C-alpha cells in the first residue's frame, strides 16, 4: 500500500469510527481521543486530516448528503423532473430524522454549527443551481442561495419539532418541508401538490437507514 492509499485508509477509518461513536455516545460526549483509540490510529494522524472534531463531523455530514443523492439517483432513476428528484432527497433526510432521534440530534448540531451550516448551504446552493438552472433561467446565484436558506430553515424546524414536542408525524414533516422548499424554488401550486403525492408514494421504496448502518 503506497503512502496515498495509507493516508486515505486512515481518513476513512476516522470518519467511519466517528460516525459510529457519534451515534452511540452523542456528538458532545465523543472526544478526539476516543475516536483515535477506537479507530486504531494515532492522535497525530487525525490532525493530519482534520483540524478538530467539527472537521470530522463536517466530512461525515458531507458524505451523508452525497449518499442520499446516490440513493435518490439509484432508486428513482426514472424520475426526470428535477423538482421531484430534489424533493425525494429532502424527504429521505426528513424520514431518517423522524425515525431515529439520533439522526435528528446530529442534524440539529450540524445546523447550529456556523462552520458546518455554511458549508451545507454553499454546496446545496450549487447543487440546486445545477439541477434547476434550466427551469429558472432568470435566477441569480443569490436567488438560489435565498431559496436554499428557506429549505435549511424548514429542515431545522422539523428537526426541532422531533427533539422537542415530537408533535408532527413523519408525513407531516415531509409535507411541511417540501411545501416550503418547492414554493421557495418557484414551483407552481399544482406542481407542488402532485410532487408531494409522488414523493410520499415513492418513499415506500427507500430505507432511510441505509445511511446509518455500520
Per-range role (PLM):
Residues 59, 70-103, 121-123:
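Hydrophobic alpha-helical connector segments
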Residues 104-109, 190-194:
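Short, hydrophobic secondary-structure boundary micro-motifs
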Residues 73-74, 106-113:
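Short linear capping/connector segments at secondary-structure termini
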Amino acid at each position: 500500500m503506497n503512502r496515498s492509499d495509507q493516508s486515505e485508509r486512515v481518513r476513512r477509518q476516522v470518519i467511519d469510527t466517528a460516525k459510529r461513536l457519534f451515534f452511540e455516545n452523542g456528538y458532545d460526549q465523543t472526544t478526539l481521543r476516543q475516536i483515535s483509540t477506537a479507530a486504531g490510529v494515532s492522535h497525530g494522524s487525525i490532525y493530519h486530516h482534520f483540524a478538530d472534531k467539527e472537521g470530522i463531523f463536517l466530512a461525515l455530514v458531507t458524505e451523508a448528503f452525497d449518499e442520499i443523492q446516490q440513493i435518490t439517483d439509484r432508486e428513482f432513476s426514472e424520475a426526470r423532473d428535477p423538482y421531484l428528484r430534489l424533493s425525494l432527497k429532502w424527504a429521505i433526510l426528513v424520514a431518517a430524522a423522524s425515525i431515529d432521534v439520533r439522526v435528528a440530534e446530529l442534524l440539529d448540531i450540524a445546523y447550529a454549527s456556523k462552520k458546518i451550516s455554511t458549508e451545507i448551504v454553499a454546496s446545496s446552493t450549487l447543487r440546486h443551481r445545477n439541477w434547476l438552472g434550466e427551469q429558472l433561467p432568470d435566477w441569480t446565484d443569490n436567488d438560489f442561495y435565498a431559496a436554499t436558506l428557506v429549505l435549511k430553515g424548514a429542515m431545522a424546524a422539523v428537526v426541532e419539532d422531533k427533539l422537542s414536542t415530537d408533535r408532527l408525524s413523519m408525513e407531516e414533516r415531509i409535507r411541511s418541508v417540501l411545501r416550503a422548499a418547492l414554493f421557495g424554488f418557484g414551483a407552481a401550486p399544482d406542481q407542488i401538490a402532485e410532487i408531494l403525492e409522488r414523493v410520499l408514494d415513492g418513499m415506500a421504496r427507500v430505507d432511510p437507514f441505509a445511511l446509518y448502518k455500520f
